[in-house]
């Protein structure tokens, strides 16, 4: 948590970029949430009356289809601009962090490098900062913002359409928060080992290239290759375990909850239909299913990048 707060503090240097990115994100989210409402209107107020009257209203249909396409284009444009601004400011922040690390290395005593390979130092300055840029600022922060904004917007819309369904769907939030914390705890171990082994690989590779003449002079080629293979094998094994854990905990649970929610919504409205109290149209049912999917999409994306926050 302390590391995350420190990384978040660098956003103060890019206030303008963050503000513009948030505005673009709000624009994109607003357009995305408006799309299902427009589709609902098309189904209930354009297509259904045409079917009942057996009259094809081409003008009205084209008008609302055009509105639907425009809304989606606005959402795409907002998402694109948000991605551009977030990636741009993440590059500038990564440069600042890399410069600070490099300046800090210059002040370290010589004894610090006695037992630390030069390749590992280089790895910390280059690859580790690149990992922070890609996993935290590009994927993590952007995903976190979009997830929060999208979830708040979806729940507000669902509550406006049907307060009962909105209250029922609220149980998903604590379930996903608890699950995310469980996944983060388990992934932290593998992620730390992954970064440590990657640094060792970089250090061994750097040393073997710089000291190639000495290695050959003392005929240590087989030993160097064996050490590198052992480290590489450990790195691959840790990566495999991390991938299995991430795939199982993120995709499996989210997919299962989505299917259960779909079943629950369909069952709820089916019982109303059988009891003769169904007060929902085809368009409204479509909107509910669409918004339920939009609840899980940001959560699923966030679960896939949660390892980058470790």
Model-derived segments and spans:
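Membrane-integrated ABC transporters
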Residues: 1-35, 47-65, 81-86, 90, ...
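N-terminal turn
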Residues: 10, 88, 120, 124, ...
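Helix-loop-helix
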Residues: 50, 157-171, 245-310
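Juxtamembrane helix-loop junctions of ABC transporter transmembrane domains
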Residues: 24, 31-47, 71-118, 122-126, ...
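Transmembrane helix-loop-helix hairpins at lipid-water interfaces of multipass membrane proteins
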Residues: 18-78, 159-164, 263, 267, ...
